Amino acid sequence: TAVLGLGDIGPAAAMPVMEGKCQLFKEFGGVDAFPICLSTKDPHEIVQTIKNISVAFGGINLEDISAPRCFEIEERLKEELDIPVFHDDQHGTAVVVLAALINALKIVGKKIKDVKVVVNGIGAAGVACSKIVMAAGVKNIIGCDTTGAIYEGRQENMNWVKDWYARNTNPTKEEG
């Protein structure tokens, strides 16, 4: 429901994207991947389907599931399966962003604890990027969505993920 640049295009239309990602797994990681697109958006149905087929796989790579549903699905699968679960939209993006930030800070001679980071878009990738840069030492991070800066006390356009985000970022409660 969240194919990059295409949005919610449905499972049949998403299949070529997933097949391409499987090719990348094989080419660059030597991993035989199998694309599976589901025709449901219900988190419970997605979790149940993956649990039911997981015995045949050594790991699960979640892809292109919209927020906030993707967070619930990933968490439940990590708790309920005994194989690795990876959500590429979150963690793949976050690792690349952290590497870029570390290298940029080396070039400009700044320390990670001294920078202010602004994240535009608090979906799967934005939240994961925020978490990884905070774990690396960023103290001042502000996330923005279509309503503006996310801060503790904001009421408009919030959900449970943005509530967590508001409690854990934007220490000076900047608005705008």
Segments from the language model and where they lie:
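N-terminal ligand-binding/catalytic initiation module
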Residues: T1-I83
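Glycine-rich phosphate/diphosphate-binding loop of Rossmann-like nucleotide-binding domains
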Residues: A2-G29, L81, V95-G176
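Hydrophobic/aromatic beta-strand patches that form the interior of the parallel beta-sheet core
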Residues: F34-I36, F86, I142-C144
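Short, ordered loop/turn segments at secondary-structure junctions
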Residues: L38-S39, D64-A67, D88-H91, T146-G148
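Gly/Ser/Thr-rich loops at beta-strand to alpha-helix junctions
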Residues: E63-C70, H91-G92, I122-V127
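Short, acidic/small-residue loops that bind anionic groups at enzyme active sites
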Residues: E80-A94
